Amino acid sequence: MLLKGTPVAERVLEKIKQEISHSSTPPGLAVVLIGNDPASEVYVGMKVKKATDLGMVSKAHRLPSDATLTDILKLIERLNNDPTIHGILVQIPLPKHLDSHAIIQAISPEKDVDGLHPVNMGKLLLGQLGGFAPCTPAGIIELLHYYEIPLLGRHVAVVGRSNIVGKPLAAMLMQKHPSTNATVTLLHSQSQNLKEILKTADIIIAAVGVPLFIKESMVSSHAVIIDVGTSRVATNNAKGYILVGDVDFNNVVTKCKAISPVPGGVGPMTVAMLMKNTWESYQKFSS
């Protein structure tokens, strides 16, 4: 079975669009782009367009690749103080000379719709309400719920320990709640006995950032696999590349119980959760 993200995302977005249509003023989403990374340009354009399509007011704030930390913090401060802005995200990756932690911490936690501020991360880890969950982990759980993949008591192997996906996702899956409450193993590319552990997992979430890392020999026939990875691999097609995930899809798809494709799996869910967080932020400010 293919766990396609597009129909799930469309359902989430349609609900948000209907709710926005009844609001007195539009939610505002500010997207900060530093530099001119081609992939980042595409992602920013996609997020701004999606927000606009839903009835939000969204704008990309572009700064050059040699922008200083002071320049960026001044922009973020202005956006923090702008009452028409309800969500702020800084597109990553950032140029290497910049301190990403300082930039993320400068965003008001109440407007941190990417869910990466230490305050929101802390609330997530403690199971406290009122914060924003990171978009990709939230999207993964929404995807699993849509396809009625049970999590309660199941062994979930998360491969990847990033602050954006692996760590927060593990924390969310472990929450003592009927919709999650999974048994989680957090792995990475250097974990010992990786293959043996993965073969015991009911659900594998691949977020290691290495193309085709998860092979057919590493998964069982009962495994449900969520592929978070997105990498460009050079080819001779018109684009000059194809997008592949962290899972060797062509060989794994015929063995596992279910798998999310790349593209069209987790990607649409990440954008949908960003819009959901922005709408929820607007509602909090409005109340």
Swiss-Prot record:
It comes from the Bacteria. InterPro entries: Aminoacid_DH-like_N_sf, NAD(P)-bd_dom_sf, THF_DH/CycHdrlase, THF_DH/CycHdrlase_cat_dom, THF_DH/CycHdrlase_CS, THF_DH/CycHdrlase_NAD-bd_dom. It catalyses: (6R)-5,10-methylene-5,6,7,8-tetrahydrofolate + NADP(+) = (6R)-5,10-methenyltetrahydrofolate + NADPH; (6R)-5,10-methenyltetrahydrofolate + H2O = (6R)-10-formyltetrahydrofolate + H(+). NADP(+) binds at residues 160-162, 189, 230. Keywords: Amino-acid biosynthesis, Histidine biosynthesis, Hydrolase, Methionine biosynthesis, Multifunctional enzyme, NADP, One-carbon metabolism, Oxidoreductase, Purine biosynthesis. One of its GO terms (cellular component) is cytosol. Its EC number is 1.5.1.5, 3.5.4.9. GO terms for molecular function: methenyltetrahydrofolate cyclohydrolase activity; methylenetetrahydrofolate dehydrogenase (NADP+) activity. The keyword NADP applies. Pathway: One-carbon metabolism; tetrahydrofolate interconversion. Pfam families: THF_DHG_CYH, THF_DHG_CYH_C. SUPFAM superfamilies: Aminoacid dehydrogenase-like, N-terminal domain (SSF53223), NAD(P)-binding Rossmann-fold domains (SSF51735). One of its GO terms (biological process) is tetrahydrofolate interconversion. Belongs to the tetrahydrofolate dehydrogenase/cyclohydrolase family. PANTHER family: C-1-TETRAHYDROFOLATE SYNTHASE, CYTOPLASMIC (PTHR48099:SF5), C-1-TETRAHYDROFOLATE SYNTHASE, CYTOPLASMIC-RELATED (PTHR48099). HAMAP family: THF_DHG_CYH. Catalyzes the oxidation of 5,10-methylenetetrahydrofolate to 5,10-methenyltetrahydrofolate and then the hydrolysis of 5,10-methenyltetrahydrofolate to 10-formyltetrahydrofolate. Homodimer. This is Bifunctional protein FolD. It comes from Chlamydia abortus (strain DSM 27085 / S26/3) (Chlamydophila abortus).
